[in-house]
Amino acid sequence: MKHDIAAKLLQIGAVALQPNEPFTWSSGLKSPIYCDNRLTLAYPGVRRLIADALAELIRTHFPKADLIAGTAAGIPHAAWVSERLELPMCYVRSQAKRHGKGKQIEGQARPGQRVVVIEDLISTGGTSLAAVRALKEAGCEVLGVAAIFTYGLEKAKQAFAAENLPAYTLTDYNTLIETAVRLGAVSEHDLATLRQWRENPEEWGS
């Protein structure tokens, strides 16, 4: 399944690899990869595959979940997953609104509910963990995070470990670059460059 999802992301252009002409992230980091999982929304077959896989992941790893929560980017996927699991859903804003009721959590998240957070992409883990903290402040028990893709950065691993929180993804960086070589999207020579970025993203390309 990891390779299937990776192949779909590459085929629809949700993930772009440019080892020789790197992207610049908003953080200023130079990267040979750019991921825009919002493109999955335009492909019904791909989004069904993702929703089915996320639902199965939750059944396997978080069978006691009774609430699905989406980050802003994870809202559509959270909706499709909650429908498959027949569970209620909410979503978590990056920060509380400054008008109306000033809510950060939209929908209903009651104290004691066991929640899985749905994210489209794990980079440093900051967005996911901000949602986790908001849900904990609301009295929920957060079981973990489920996402489509992760870069597998050490910073994210450390962040989730610090919160003692499991995070599972449908596919990952290593699987994706291996799949890209198999599909002819990048060369074996490019693979070495892509692996170097993964080992030291802060220094790569500097």
Swiss-Prot record:
Pathway: Pyrimidine metabolism; UMP biosynthesis via de novo pathway; UMP from orotate: step 1/2. It comes from the Bacteria. Keywords: Glycosyltransferase, Magnesium, Pyrimidine biosynthesis, Transferase. GO terms for biological process: 'de novo' UMP biosynthetic process; pyrimidine nucleobase biosynthetic process. Its EC number is 2.4.2.10. 5-phospho-alpha-D-ribose 1-diphosphate binds at residues 93, 97, 99, 119-127. It catalyses: orotidine 5'-phosphate + diphosphate = orotate + 5-phospho-alpha-D-ribose 1-diphosphate. One of its GO terms (molecular function) is magnesium ion binding. Orotate binds at residue 123. The keyword Transmembrane does not apply. Induction: Repressed by uracil. Its cofactor is Mg(2+). Belongs to the purine/pyrimidine phosphoribosyltransferase family. PyrE subfamily. HAMAP family: PyrE. Homodimer. PANTHER family: OROTATE PHOSPHORIBOSYLTRANSFERASE, URIDINE 5'-MONOPHOSPHATE SYNTHASE. Catalyzes the transfer of a ribosyl phosphate group from 5-phosphoribose 1-diphosphate to orotate, leading to the formation of orotidine monophosphate (OMP). This is Orotate phosphoribosyltransferase. It comes from Bacillus caldolyticus. The lineage of its organism: Bacteria, Bacillati, Bacillota, Bacilli, Bacillales. The gene is pyrE.
